[in-house]
């Protein structure tokens, strides 16, 4: 013989359950149906490709500035090397006593 919920709560000292109209967190589905599952492919994103093209165009527009800066740095390096070798030659002449 099965006891009713009211009789069971009365004999055991347990409060009667709340009305079934009250929503609780556990009653909600665990996963929203709008989320992708593992088997579905993502929709192609065009925003990233557009940003990449824009970035490439901006860099291409700065090519003259980048090339000029690179040539300046190469020139400064070569001048520094030339000065260094001249100083080495002067040092060797001083050690030999020719200067």
UniProtKB/Swiss-Prot annotation:
Stretches in topological domain Lumenal: 61-67
Subcellular location: Plastid, Chloroplast thylakoid membrane
Transmembrane regions: 68-88
SUPFAM superfamilies, sorted: PetM subunit of the cytochrome b6f complex
Presence of the UniProt keyword S-adenosyl-L-methionine in the record: no
Membrane topology: Single-pass membrane protein
Any one of the GO CC terms: cytochrome b6f complex
The keyword Plastid appears for this protein: yes
Domain of life: Eukaryota
Main location: plastid
First and last residues of the transit peptide: 1-60
Keywords: Chloroplast, Electron transport, Membrane, Plastid, Respiratory chain, Thylakoid, Transit peptide, Transmembrane, Transmembrane helix, Transport
Stromal topology ranges: 89-99
General function of this protein: Component of the cytochrome b6-f complex, which mediates electron transfer between photosystem II (PSII) and photosystem I (PSI), cyclic electron flow around PSI, and state transitions.
Subunit description: The 4 large subunits of the cytochrome b6-f complex are cytochrome b6, subunit IV (17 kDa polypeptide, PetD), cytochrome f and the Rieske protein, while the 4 small subunits are PetG, PetL, PetM and PetN. The complex functions as a dimer.
HAMAP family in the cross-refs: Cytb6_f_PetM (MF_00396)
Assigned protein family: Belongs to the PetM family.
Name of the featured protein: Cytochrome b6-f complex subunit 7, chloroplastic
């Amino acid at each position: 013989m099965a006891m009713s919920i009211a009789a069971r709560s009365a004999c055991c000292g347990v409060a009667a359950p709340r009305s079934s109209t009250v929503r609780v967190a556990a009653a909600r589905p665990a996963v929203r149906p709008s989320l992708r599952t593992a088997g579905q492919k993502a929709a192609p994103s065009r925003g990233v490709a557009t940003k990449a093209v824009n970035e490439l165009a901006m860099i291409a527009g700065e090519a003259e500035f980048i090339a000029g800066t690179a040539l300046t740095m190469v020139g400064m390096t070569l001048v520094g090397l030339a000065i260094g070798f001249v100083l080495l030659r002067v040092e060797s002449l001083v050690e030999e006593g020719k200067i």
